Regions:
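Gly/Ala-rich beta-loop-alpha elbow adjacent to hydrolase catalytic centers
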Residues: 177-186
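N-terminal cap/lid segment of alpha/beta-hydrolase-fold proteins
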Residues: 35-82
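Conserved alpha/beta-hydrolase
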Residues: 123-141
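The feature captures the conserved acid-bearing segment of alpha/beta-hydrolase catalytic domains
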Residues: 209-276
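Hydrolase active-site cap/lid region
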Residues: 185-227
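Alpha/beta-hydrolase active-site loop
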Residues: 144-169
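C-terminal catalytic histidine-bearing segment of alpha/beta-hydrolase fold enzymes
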Residues: 270-327
Length: 327
């Protein structure tokens, strides 16, 4: 195994968390609530309406191939624009739809104020700014989630959102992470960006083709133009000895096979990147898919500069994944 890569044998001990002394919400709360019915139909936000949300620092207008979307974000702890912010943690959520365009979950009952409160708690806990990045069609963002998720367009939009926020707030480096499809996006951006200090892939599919093959999803396999595979970009990941990558998963998972996550980690290790595979049998039944609390914790600790051994021990000492709405 190359230097900087490790399969984790976790030994637990309790760790106190660093606290921010003055992490204030950057985004402005409102009474807006998220609607699952709107997600099923597709969310449209006009450019002018998006400008009003931009003034509240909960949105950015992003264009790819001449078509724009109003993508939402919920932030706390940032120095006001134009910054500077030496580092900021950003989390990309997992899917909020299942196998049907009418099966929507996770965001129901939440709204802008709740998301800002969530990020404020994380910013205060870890002492660095925290942002929740809403993918197209979800958590208030415009777009049609059913047809955009997992696509090259989604990846391009989310990468462009990071660029807009980087410029707006003077972010020098990102600690970037995500759950499930958000973790897949995180892996994809390893090859697209030179400003990642941390990458946390939590219950993700960073070897997307291998995931489709393992699950026997032949319809998707027959349309490779409809998805992206971060494993195809492994040789384009820039070398950065300061960057740390954590691949977190539950070996019992039935949705994204852990072997596919292990294979991606091993490919990172073979190329000499500083990466750690973190197997945690802590996700809830029946699918063993959610480790969001663990991913957020790894992201906050890595972004705040905590040494790797303490990060791994903290994850080991945490209780099992709790029920939660946001992902």
């Amino acid at each position: 195994m190359r230097r900087g890569a490790a399969v984790v044998i976790l030994a637990g001990f309790a760790l106190s968390m660093p606290m921010a002394t003055a992490a204030q919400a950057q985004s402005q709360p409102s009474a807006e609530r998220f609607s699952n019915a709107a997600v099923a139909e597709g969310v449209t936000i006009a450019r002018g309406d998006c400008a009003a949300l931009e003034a509240q620092e909960t949105a950015a207008w992003v264009e790819v191939d001449g078509r724009g979307e109003c993508l939402r974000y919920y932030a706390a702890g940032l120095r006001p624009a134009p910054g500077p912010n030496p580092i900021a943690a950003a989390w990309m959520h997992g899917d909020i739809m299942g196998t049907k365009p009418t099966s929507v979950g996770h965001q129901e009952g939440l709204g802008v104020a709740a998301m800002i409160d969530q990020e404020r708690a994380l910013a205060e806990r870890f002492g660095i700014p925290f942002l929740f990045l809403a993918r197209p069609g979800a958590y208030g963002s415009s777009g049609r989630f059913w047809t955009t998720r997992h696509t090259p367009r989604e990846a391009a939009l989310m990468n462009a959102l990071l660029d807009v926020l980087k410029a707006r707030y003077g972010v020098a480096a990102w600690a970037l992470g995500g759950h499930s499809a958000g973790g897949t996006l995180t892996a994809e951006f390893l090859a697209r960006r030179h400003d990642l200090r941390c990458a946390v892939i939590s219950s993700g599919a960073p070897a997307y083709r291998a995931y489709l093959e393992a699950r026997g999803l032949r319809t998707a396999l027959a349309r490779p133009q409809g998805w992206f595979d971060p494993a195809d970009s492994l040789d384009r990941i820039p070398r950065d000895p300061k960057r740390r990558v954590f691949v977190i998963g539950d070996p019992r998972e039935t949705n994204i096979p852990f072997d596919t996550q292990r294979g991606y980690f091993e490919a990172l290790a073979a190329r000499g990147h500083a990466a750690w595979l973190v197997p945690l049998e802590r996700a809830p039944a029946p699918r063993r898919h959610s480790l969001v609390d663990f991913g957020e914790t790894a992201l906050g600790l890595c972004g705040s500069g905590t040494d790797t051994g303490r990060i791994l021990a903290t994850l080991k000492a945490m209780p099992d994944q709790r029920d939660r709405i946001s992902n």
